[in-house]
């Protein structure tokens, strides 16, 4: 097996302020805690097209954020391309995200004053591994691949939601990451554009063999992935 993501007994607990102990003479308050994830384990192999699914509050976005090194693990560990995240500091996590992970967000997260091509170029510029000419060539090519030929010089505000999400996909893909994480990528799109985006991602997954992991409760997305990891109340749901 060629595991690109390995999740080992992961727990995530959030502190939600303080509350006084009932029926206690103690003056000290206790911290209220929410257990977002509780003992989750799973493995995702290279090239898989996978969804983390579940109802609102199930922990799917929390798990995606932990895989993406956007949040800290309370206990357990997650390995991305062989690298454990639990012991990493902020600088190490930033470097991992920059080099190994591509992100696709439901709100696109594009910089409004930059053109489509400039938004895509940013991901490569942060790597400091390519010349200016290479950055432009790679960005141009990937925008063509996602169907935005002729739109490279347009600002996000001049494009539809589906086109903006294509820029987001191109930005994630251009640096050839080990894994792409997509948080509800169709949530802001109509059914037609949702279908087009998922079909595009399937094609790119097959062509480039890049692991894609979605968090979603969209039935259409779940019907089109090859594997579903289901969560309920912060735990794996095997029903």
Regions found by a protein language model. Give the residues of each.
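H-loop (His-switch) and adjacent beta-strand-loop-beta switch element
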Residues: 228-239
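ABC family nucleotide-binding domain
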Residues: 3-224, 228
């Amino acid at each position: 097996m060629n595991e690109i993501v390995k999740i080992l007994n992961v727990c995530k607990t959030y502190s939600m302020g303080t509350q006084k102990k009932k029926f206690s003479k103690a003056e000290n308050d206790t911290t209220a805690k929410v257990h977002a994830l509780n003992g989750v384990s799973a493995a995702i192999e290279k090239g898989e097209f996978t969804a983390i699914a579940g109802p609102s509050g199930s922990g799917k976005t929390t798990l995606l954020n932990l895989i993406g090194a956007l949040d800290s693990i309370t206990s357990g560990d997650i390995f991305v391309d062989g690298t454990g995240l639990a012991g990493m500091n902020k600088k190490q996590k930033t470097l991992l995200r920059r080099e190994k992970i591509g992100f696709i967000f439901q709100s696109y997260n594009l910089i409004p004053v930059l053109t489509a091509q400039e938004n895509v170029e940013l991901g490569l510029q942060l790597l400091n591994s390519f010349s200016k000419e290479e950055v432009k060539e790679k960005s141009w090519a990937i925008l063509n691949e996602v169907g935005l030929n002729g739109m490279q010089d347009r600002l996000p505000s001049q494009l539809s939601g589906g086109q903006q999400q294509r820029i987001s996909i191109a930005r994630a893909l251009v640096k050839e990451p080990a894994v792409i994480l997509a948080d509800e990528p169709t949530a802001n799109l109509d059914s037609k554009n949702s279908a087009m985006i998922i079909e595009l991602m399937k094609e790119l997954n097959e062509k480039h063999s890049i692991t894609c992991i979605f968090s979603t409760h969209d039935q259409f997305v779940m019907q089109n992935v090859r594997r579903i990891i289901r969560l309920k109340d912060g735990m794996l749901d095997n029903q």
